[in-house]
Amino acid sequence: MAVLTDDQVDAALPELGGWERADGVLRRSVKFPAFLDGIEAVRRVAERAEAKDHHPDIDIRWRTVTFVLVTHSEGGITEKDLQMAREIDEILDR
């Protein structure tokens, strides 16, 4: 799968809730009402990522969870990352 250009990624960002392109990755941070709410969201994202075999980097800091997407095997952001960002949005926006 081909690495997307910055322009291609930037064109997709408006449809992605709260994602940004920074340092060659897609990143979204979400603050949850409680620590366990964030953990539950991580569990649901992990299930979807496992099913898709495309795993985000996930950082948990108390109530704030940060998801980072990049296709390491391709060395950049690909359509797989955009699709996983959409799926994470779907999970988080329920």
Curated annotation (Swiss-Prot):
Protein keywords: Lyase
Principal EC category: lyase
Record EC number: 4.2.1.96
Keyword Lyase set for record: yes
A molecular function GO annotation: 4-alpha-hydroxytetrahydrobiopterin dehydratase activity
Source organism, top-level taxon: Bacteria
Recorded catalytic activity of this chain's protein: (4aS,6R)-4a-hydroxy-L-erythro-5,6,7,8-tetrahydrobiopterin = (6R)-L-erythro-6,7-dihydrobiopterin + H2O
Pfam families the record matches: Pterin_4a
InterPro entries xref list: PCD_sf, Pterin_deHydtase
UniProt-listed GO biological process terms: tetrahydrobiopterin biosynthetic process
Keyword Disulfide bond: no
UniProt-listed PANTHER family: PTERIN-4-ALPHA-CARBINOLAMINE DEHYDRATASE (PTHR12599:SF0)
Xref: HAMAP family: Pterin_4_alpha
Membership in a protein family: Belongs to the pterin-4-alpha-carbinolamine dehydratase family.
Protein name: Putative pterin-4-alpha-carbinolamine dehydratase
Species assigned in the record: Mycobacterium sp. (strain JLS)
